[in-house]
Amino acid sequence: RLDYLDLYLIHWPLPKRDNYIEAWQALIEAKKRGLVRSIGVSNFEKAHLDKIIKATGVVPAVNQNEIHPYWPQKDLVAINQKYNILTEAWSPLGRGNQAELSEATINILAEKYNKNNGQIIIKWLLQRGILPVVKSASPQNQRANLNVFDFQLTSDDMKQLDQLGRADGRVDNQDPKTY
């Protein structure tokens, strides 16, 4: 039995249903009652954030979004930073997209730093101020995912990784405006 949750997120804004403000108000109430320590959102874009903040005056602690080298979401990360919202990346390794994971730029950096490609991507996110949520069933990969604090990517490295973004980089085309 739990007395409280550390963090509770609204998973999608679902704009077609247009009830995410009511859902946000319910999370605010749960936080006031001590059932939740922090509240946040997932897959919210600027318009969604603006709408809930304007309606309630409460800024989410976290906005969890799809972010990886093919879909870097620079504008959304900047909006989250403006509101002092922690950006959390889901599918930071592009759901294991082998084309993305084996990009030449990532391969070169992995060799340069004696790291694996996933570690390069995780470090790129961390240096952008983004918290990656990496999942793995393999204890070996779990340990590797944590072994990213003994090196720093240079600003040139970061720029090279930033340039991997694509207009069609989303995984499964899950657009928060229509999903």
Regions found by a protein language model. Give the residues of each.
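Phosphate/pyrophosphate-binding loops at sites that engage ATP/ADP/AMP, CoA/4′-phosphopantetheine
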Residues: 1-3
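Acidic/hydrophobic-patterned starts of short beta strands in beta-sheet-rich repeat architectures
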Residues: 7-8
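Beta/alpha (TIM)-barrel catalytic core signal, keyed to glycine-rich beta->alpha loops juxtaposed to Asp/Glu
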Residues: 12-179
